[in-house]
Every structure is written in structure tokens, then in C-alpha cells.
């Protein structure tokens, strides 16, 4: 009986040991599976994190490239605008210089023309002064000396004298002469200075009355002669 009980005990022990071993194996397998799951999860998390980092780095690279391209485009536009502004300013400066040169040339030409005209006038005046025309006295003398030649009338002499140039002294002397001219039709006497300037004669009241009487008589006779009233 004792032997049988010992066998039963050994069998129960072996069964309990087998159960414990199976439990331990199941626990180990569950632990291994949990470990494998955790490792796979960690690996997936790591992979996802690495992919997220790569995407972020790509986005950053794209942003940096965009910012660099925008900065380069802005710099190129600013450089082009600066070059255009500099070229426009240079063009304006060149135009201003060209206009100034034209103005200077025109001024120089005008000055040269004025100098030439002044020189020509001075030469003409000098020649006229050096070679004055003959006066009336010279014509009278020549006419008196040349008795055999044709005699010139007063009109011809005046025409010849008008054609000849006169000096300033001769002109002043001619204009300073005052003479009395009597109108043959009316009998009026006038004071004429030079070529035709009429002067007023200052007289007394009595002389003024006599002059008016003579003038009215002469005017009446001239009117009657024109009208044919006189015999």
C-alpha cells in the first residue's frame, strides 16, 4: 500500500511538474510574442518616425529652395531695376550734356556772326569817311570851270547829290540851314529848316495881323485864278 501511495505521489508530482512546465512554456511563449509585438511596434514607430523626419527634411529643403529662389529672383529684379535706373540716369546725363553742347555751339556761332557784321559795318563806315562824296560847292566850281560843257539844272544837281553818299558833318550842316520859302500861288512865306522842317516864326501882334492879311489875299487870288474868275 505504501508503494502504491508513493507511486501515486510521484505521478501527481510529475503531473504537477508537467503542468508547471507547460504553464512556464505558455508564459514564455506569451512573453516572446509580446516581445515580438513590442519590437515590431517599436520598429514600426521608428520607421514612421524616420519617414516623418525625412518628409520634414524634404519640406524644409523645398522651403529653403523656394526662399532661395525667391530671394534670387528679388535680387535679380532689384539688380535689373538698379541697372535700368542707372542706364536711364546715364541717358539723361548724356542728353543734358548734348543739349548744353548744342547751346554753346549756337552761342559761339552767334557771337562770330555778330563780330563779322560789326567788322563789316566798321569797314563800310571807314570807307565812306575816307572817300566822301562831292559837295554842291565842288559841283558849282566844276560847272563854272567847264564852260564849254553842258550846264546842269538844279534838279539834276539835286539828283546827283542825292545819289552820292554824304558825311555826317555835311548832313548836319545841310539840316542846320534855315531859309525863307515863298509860295508862288498864295504868297505865304514859311521858315523851313533843312530838307523840309517847317518852323514857326515868333513875331508881334501887328506883324501877325499883316501876315494874316497878306495870306488871305494870296489865298483869295489863288482860288480865283484856279476857278477862272479873274480876267
From Swiss-Prot:
GO terms for cellular component: nuclear speck; nucleolus. GO terms for molecular function: identical protein binding. Residues 64-89 have a biased composition (Low complexity). It is found in: Nucleus, Nucleolus; Nucleus speckle. Residues 1-154 are annotated as: Disordered. It comes from the Eukaryota. Its main location: nucleus. There is a cross-link at residue 193 (Glycyl lysine isopeptide (Lys-Gly) (interchain with G-Cter in SUMO2)). InterPro entries: Nucl_RNA-splicing_assoc_SR-25. Residues 20-34 have a biased composition (Basic and acidic residues). Interacts with ARL6. Interacts with ZCCHC17. Interacts with SRSF2. Belongs to the ARL6IP4 family. Involved in modulating alternative pre-mRNA splicing with either 5' distal site activation or preferential use of 3' proximal site. This is ADP-ribosylation factor-like protein 6-interacting protein 4.
Amino acid at each position: 500500500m505504501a508503494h502504491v501511495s508513493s507511486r501515486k505521489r510521484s505521478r501527481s508530482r510529475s503531473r504537477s511538474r508537467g503542468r508547471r512546465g507547460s504553464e512556464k512554456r505558455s508564459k514564455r511563449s506569451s512573453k516572446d510574442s509580446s516581445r515580438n509585438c513590442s519590437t515590431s511596434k517599436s520598429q514600426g514607430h521608428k520607421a514612421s518616425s524616420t519617414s516623418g523626419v525625412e518628409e520634414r527634411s524634404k519640406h524644409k529643403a523645398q522651403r529653403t529652395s523656394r526662399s532661395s529662389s525667391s530671394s534670387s529672383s528679388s535680387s535679380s529684379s532689384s539688380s535689373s531695376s538698379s541697372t535700368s535706373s542707372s542706364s536711364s540716369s546715364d541717358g539723361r546725363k548724356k542728353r543734358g550734356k548734348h543739349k548744353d553742347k548744342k547751346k554753346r555751339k549756337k552761342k559761339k556761332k552767334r557771337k562770330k556772326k555778330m563780330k563779322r557784321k560789326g567788322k563789316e559795318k566798321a569797314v563800310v563806315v571807314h570807307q565812306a569817311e575816307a572817300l566822301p562824296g562831292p559837295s554842291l560847292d565842288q559841283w558849282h566850281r566844276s560847272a563854272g570851270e567847264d564852260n564849254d560843257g553842258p550846264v546842269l539844272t538844279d534838279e539834276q544837281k539835286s539828283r546827283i547829290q542825292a545819289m552820292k553818299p554824304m558825311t555826317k558833318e555835311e548832313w548836319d550842316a545841310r539840316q542846320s540851314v534855315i531859309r525863307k520859302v515863298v509860295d508862288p500861288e498864295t504868297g505865304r512865306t514859311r521858315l523851313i529848316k533843312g530838307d523840309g522842317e517847317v518852323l514857326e516864326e515868333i513875331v508881334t501882334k501887328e506883324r501877325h495881323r499883316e501876315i494874316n492879311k497878306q495870306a488871305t489875299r494870296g489865298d483869295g487870288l489863288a482860288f480865283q485864278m484856279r476857278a477862272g474868275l479873274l480876267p
